[in-house]
Structure formats: structure tokens, C-alpha cells
């Protein structure tokens, strides 16, 4: 073992306070070349956000069948229309593929907590059918840490509007680079992240073999997959 270590050892120098990673000499050389000609994502005019945290997915993430049931239980056409607008498609990390995603038939009950000075929080009293559904989970949603002003509301989210914009999304755990463009108003379930505003140019770079190689060297191994952390 001692001879093997002496033969295979490599010196790694960490000259800054930035995050560091142990690489072979040739890997260090490749990393330096990429970073010398590339522009860090933090210097692009973009934002990287985490997906939605509900605190209790069983209550707030529902199937197509449950969505239809909630809408059918609305007492007026006005309530039905407002309720339909509040229930939005949501993607999970496992649904996201390279340049695309799988329609999963899942929806988020977006009883958001509003944005101060911009959007008022959802008042559950205005959505009786949704309230009836959530009341079935009261013991769970009332105790959860991630909640808004009331147990019916989701936690504060300052970038709520950005979920309605085109965005680049990816799963938190991947075997390879799998970035997709989502152009509709779908939400993303945490811990999956998203980039806004979206760019086809950036999407192509992130899905390239070079970016895949680079991110793999910096990613965190978990469950034989890579937690892709970019920024």
C-alpha cells in the first residue's frame, strides 16, 4: 500500500478560498483550461433558484384525477375557474431528461403566501373545494415547518413569478447532464433547481459533453449518481 501511494500520489494546490476538489494532474490541467476561457455562471445575467418546498407533498401535489375531483366539487363557475388557475403542473427531478421532460400528470396546489407589496397571499376561504381537500391532511400540514401565514399556505417564495417564465431545469441527482427547457408555467419540485431567464444557447452548453465532464468532476456523488451543483 505504501509503494502504491508513493507511485500514485499527486500534489494539489488550493490557492484561494473557493471550493476545492481533488483531481489528477491531467484533470487539473483540463479544469484550468476550461475556466480560463469560460465565463462563470455567476457572471451571466441569470438567477438560479430552488424548486418549490411544500412541507407535505401528499397534500399539495395531486394527481390529474384529484385535480378533476377538486374542480368538480366547486360550487360556482367562478370558483372553478379560479381554482383551475391555482392548480398548476409540477415536474419532479426524475421527470426531467436531456432536452425534454416526461408529462407526469401531477399538479401543485399553489396556495402561495404572496409577495410583499406585489401579490397578496391566497385566502383559503375563497377556495372552498381546495380547503375541503387540504382539511383531510390538517394534522400534517398544521405541524409542518415549511408553511406560510396559515397552514393552508405554502412558504414564502420571493421568486414566485419566475415559475411562470421559460426556465432551464434539471434533476438534483443525475447519471449525466440532463438539462431541459420548460416554456410553460409549470412549477419545479425541490430540490430540483431552475435557471431564469432561459437561453437555448446556455441549454446547449450545459448539455454538452464538455460541460458534462466538468460538472461531474465538481459534483457530489450520492446514490451512485451526481448531485449537480452549478453556479
Model regions and ranges:
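Polybasic, glycine- and aromatic-enriched phosphate-binding surface used to engage nucleic acids
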Residues: 3-231
